[in-house]
Amino acid sequence: MIPEPDEVGPSLRAAMARMAGPDPSLTPIVLGWATVDLDRAEHAFRAALLGFTMASEDMPDDALLGARCRLIRTAVPGVATALLLEPFTEGRLAATLARHGEGPAAVWLREDPAWDPPGSAAAASAPMGRRSSPAQGPFGTEVLLRDGARSGPYRILIVAEPGTITP
């Protein structure tokens, strides 16, 4: 369910911060909103954001979640974007919808490599074994951080943006 217009910004910001977690080396980029119908969810966002500028753009599918993706760009302070997610497989997103219904389901993060140099205590607390194999997503190559429930919400780390070459 989409929040009321005056609650949209604070509600989405709170969900994104909660899912991003306390790690200061990870910056939340966009909140993923699970839905069974992209068009209906976009219409609901437009209705809730009446008075705010909003644009949408279909994005590449997310292989890790098994989702079709549509990026919503808004003028809501603090929440410039949201990513609508509709399952196209019986994968992670379908499980999330079955268990939790529509709503916040994922957050995409970027890692600040300068925050913790390799070998530091904080870097050692997030072992590579807790990350999925890389896959393609709406923002480039990504990995799932396996530190939450199997049915979500999910934390997805962008490891290479489109057009970048990974070693």
Residues covered by each model-derived region:
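N-terminal domain-onset segments
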Residues: 12-51
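A structural preference for short, hydrophobic beta-strand core positions in alpha/beta folds
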Residues: 56-58
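Vicinal oxygen chelate
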Residues: 1-27, 61-65, 69-88, 106-110, ...
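Long, folded non-catalytic interaction modules
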Residues: 102-103
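Amphipathic alpha-helical segments
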Residues: 37-54, 113-125
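Zn2+-dependent peptidoglycan hydrolase active-site motif and core
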Residues: 93
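Donor-sugar nucleotide-binding helix/loop cap in glycosyltransferases
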Residues: 97-98
